[in-house]
A protein has these predicted regions:
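Interaction interfaces in information-processing and related assembly proteins
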Residues: 2-114, 152-153
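Residue-level signature of catalytic and energy-coupling elements of molecular machines
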Residues: 42, 123, 132
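Short functional micro-motifs and their immediate structural scaffolds
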Residues: 110, 127-128, 149
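Residue-level signal for mature regions of secreted extracellular proteins and peptides
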Residues: 113-116, 134-137
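Cys/His-enriched microdomains
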Residues: 118-121, 139
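Short, cysteine/histidine-rich loop/knuckle motifs that typically chelate Zn2+
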Residues: 122-123, 143
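Short Cys/His-rich "knuckle" micro-motifs
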Residues: 130-134, 151-153
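Cysteine-rich micro-motifs
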Residues: 138-146
Length: 153
């Protein structure tokens, strides 16, 4: 009796596998393979931030609809008089951050299309692959991000 071939129960997520590559393996990828992996990573990030922004806006809108001003108690016992407004503002701020990240991702994808992805906007040198993998929409190399080398005294 022949054994049936079993499909893996936990298929490997290609983005997760890429994120777990050793730096030596990452540096050994061809430019084309590296850019293809980065594009996949950026597109995955875009989906994540889009979903996050939509969820946070929906939660903020729900707070407004579910908590009419007449229902809010401002006594010492409830202790929740201002928390709805604070929670809503927090959700809106986080949604704004997610939307800003989407803009950064879109810019990185446009740079990829123009052939300038991975170049530091300040010094025009290549941003290390490990930094781009960690922050795929990085605009600056670490040196420029930190403001250059400190002056000696």
């Amino acid at each position: 009796m022949a054994k049936a071939i079993q499909e893996p129960t936990n298929p490997v997520d290609p983005v997760e596998a890429y994120l777990n590559l050793d730096d030596d393996v990452l540096d050994g990828l061809s430019d084309g393979d590296f850019l293809a992996q980065q594009r996949l990573l950026l597109e995955t990030e875009r989906v994540h931030y889009t979903e996050q922004a939509a969820q946070l806006r929906a939660e903020a809108d729900s707070m407004v609809q579910n908590n009419e001003p007449a229902e809010v108690q401002f006594d010492e016992e409830s202790g929740e008089g201002g928390t709805t407004a604070i929670d809503r503002e927090r959700d809106l701020a986080l949604a704004g951050s997610a939307l800003a990240a989407i803009e950064e991702v879109d810019l990185a994808l446009r740079k990829m299309d123009r052939g300038v992805y991975g170049l530091c906007e300040s010094c025009k040198q290549s941003i290390p692959r490990a930094r781009l993998r960690a922050l795929p929409f990085a605009r600056l190399c670490v040196r420029c991000k930190e403001g250059g080398l400190p002056r000696s005294r």
